[in-house]
């Protein structure tokens, strides 16, 4: 008879690496041209003035300025960057 039980197998123990999504520069903060503002899956936020969109729906600043989050509709928000005057 064995003194130790055989090591059984398990179906658990795996997890995916986090994708680090979310807002990187918040409203009222300063952004430099090229700065990533939001990393997202799909277009939760739409690009507004002076904001570009990457092929993975990442929003980034096209000019230096202040980031603003604006409501287009009740549910839909767009992000714009306005240059400092």
Swiss-Prot record:
Swiss-Prot/TrEMBL keywords: Ribonucleoprotein, Ribosomal protein
GO molecular function: structural constituent of ribosome
GO process terms (BP): translation
Coiled-coil features, chain-numbered ranges: none
Key word Cytoplasm present: no
Family, per entry: Belongs to the bacterial ribosomal protein bL27 family.
Name listed for the protein in its UniProt record: Large ribosomal subunit protein bL27
Species, as recorded: Leptospira biflexa serovar Patoc (strain Patoc 1 / ATCC 23582 / Paris)
């Amino acid at each position: 008879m064995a003194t130790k039980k055989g090591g059984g197998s398990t179906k658990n123990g795996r997890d995916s690496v986090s994708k680090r999504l979310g807002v990187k520069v918040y409203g009222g903060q300063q952004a430099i041209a090229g700065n990533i503002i939001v990393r997202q899956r799909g277009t939760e936020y739409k690009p507004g003035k002076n904001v570009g969109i990457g092929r993975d729906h990442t929003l980034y600043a096209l000019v230096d300025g202040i980031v603003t989050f604006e409501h287009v509709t009740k549910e839909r928000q767009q992000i714009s960057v306005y240059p400092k005057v």
